[in-house]
Amino acid sequence: MSDSENEYDETDQLVKEEDEKMSDQRLTSEGADTSAEPKKKYDPKDPLRPRRKKARRACFACQRAHLTCGDERPCQRCIKRNLMESCQDGVRKKAKYLHDAPPEALRPVLGPNYNPNPTPRQNGHRHPSIQTSEASSNQGTFFSQSPATQFPLFSAAQTPIGNLAETLPFANQQSPTSPSFQTSGNPQISGMTVPQVSSPMTNFGTLPFDPSDPNIYNFNLEGLNFGSQYGAMEFGMLGHMSSGAAETPPGDATMARSASGSLGFGPGVFGNGVNQFDNVYEGNILDGFLGLDANHNGLYSQGNLQHGLPHAYAIAAGPTSIQSPSTDTNSPQPTPLGFEGSPTMATFSTTPGSKPANQQRPSTRQSNAIAKLGQQSVLGKRQRDPSFVYDTVKEPFGYVSSFHKLFILIQKRFTAAHTSRIAKSLASIRPSLMASTKNLTKQDLVFMEKYFQRSLLEYEEFMHQCSSPTLACRRTGEVAIVNKEFCALTGWTKDVLLGKEPNLNVNLGGSASANTNSKARVGLATPRLKSLNTESGGSTDGPRPVYLAELLDHESVVEFYEDYSQLAFNDSRGHKTRKCRLLKYRAPDKDDGTGESSTDGQLPQKDPRNSILSNRVAKIDGEHGISKLERDGKLECSYTWTIKRDVFDMPMLFVINVST
């Protein structure tokens, strides 16, 4: 073992001596003046010393001699030593996590499709406008790229079309749902010419740089002046990517406008002597639709799905249906594209003398179509624009009246022992709330409400993506936002929780022994609370949202407010996790209006023809799985909640995540 190591050491020593002699000979041969001063030696700790260019790969000879190699093959050192034939990439030492990887996967520089001399692709239908020369890479040049071939969209001369009906890709196909119309050959079509749409432009099929070209990694690290080579290489790669973005051709909307303005269909195109396509739509209506934002108001933006349904294609009516799956066909709401008076396909028959039903359209039809699209651009029922919050909130929220309603609710629904424990918890945070709001003016309270509504926009977007049942409440306990998972779990609808519909729940969660002597009072709880919705003033006008105390049983509500007194002002980053019992929503019977609970506990059925789901889905059935969890109208769950504070360091809202 020692003999072999000595042999390798002697060989390496000879190779190093030979390299030093070759470098000395090169210096003496290249230098014109042999009496020049000797080569200056730099301090290895000098930050301004010239550094070697780091190579990303090395051949076997350079790797064995621990010398800097180049990216070309054969390298310069192997050429000087007459080792051109054996100059191949050396095998680098694998990391432990790459032992199972094949050697071909460990070559990030030269890909399998790299061609140092790219040739332009010849297309039979398009002619290249610029002939590219053979690309040559220079070792001392940085950011070298191979020039990309440019192809014009059309030739400069107008190209005559032989037959328009034959060149169209869908000439012989027919839609199963569209009415058929007659077509006849016309010799005038063969003479129609297509003008030049745009100037020659860069081919979109090629990247601005070749990722397999090793020259793209040839960065001038010293010139970039980075403290780390990794940051310099990342900055250089971003420079490569942005260099091609500066030569981006005009946008699609501009191209579409120019194309629609250049292509004209005169009366002689269809040979029937009638100019059908000139006055059907105005000339600028197509430009108006093509200039809309593709993400919001585009022609394919599913603007008709504004009724809370999932954005998915509806299934066809049956296996024998020839109707394609589409949201426009099956949606109960019409698509707001503004073509109420547009002619149908049957109008454009090629028989002589036939005229479209609408030769002229009023000038206001274009503005109405764009206005309707602008109204449908809002995502969901709640506007996502923050300026909407700042413009609509003019008055502060009435927290005082909301707390009074909470106290009345607690006194009517809970026993004296439970009411005493809840009042004790709320009394512990009452001085802190009064001290925090003592110096706040009306403008501060309005700003507090704007901050609350602005935060709801962020939480609402997050709760739509959250798969667990979640709801957020004000510091008074009123439900502010809730997701559909919570509604499916408890049976409470979103409109009832937010106060848009009256609360008709008769499942109060009390035990039979606790409510035997106060059955009349419990039965009158719902009508009295309903009257409180009209006895509100200021900014709290309108229906009353449901309190959190109405969603939990008695013991769970007491435990919640005991935790609330600890997290309100003491622990700003804390959270609590407890077990609870959620109350299922139970509507009263139609025959009995005294407030007795129904036996089945299901919501009253609505007419499916009047619902937003139409005849596709009449009701989401979640009772089969939830009925296994509930017992006496209660769901055994666990919840985790935390408190979010506002800019005045006051409890703003608490977010609750429920898990069964």
Curated annotation (Swiss-Prot):
Superkingdom of the source species: Eukaryota
Listed Acidic residues bias regions: 1-12
CDD domains given in the database record: GAL4 (cd00067)
Compositional bias (Basic and acidic residues): 13-24, 36-49
A Pfam family reported for this protein in Swiss-Prot or TrEMBL: PAS_13
Disordered: annotated segments: 1-52, 98-144, 170-191, 319-368, 587-613
GO annotations of cellular component type: nucleus
UniProt keyword list: Activator, DNA-binding, Gluconeogenesis, Metal-binding, Nucleus, Transcription, Transcription regulation, Zinc
GO MF term list: DNA-binding transcription factor activity, RNA polymerase II-specific; RNA polymerase II transcription regulatory region sequence-specific DNA binding; zinc ion binding
Protein name per its UniProtKB record: Transcription activator of gluconeogenesis CHGG_09150
Species this protein is from: Chaetomium globosum (strain ATCC 6205 / CBS 148.51 / DSM 1962 / NBRC 6347 / NRRL 1970)
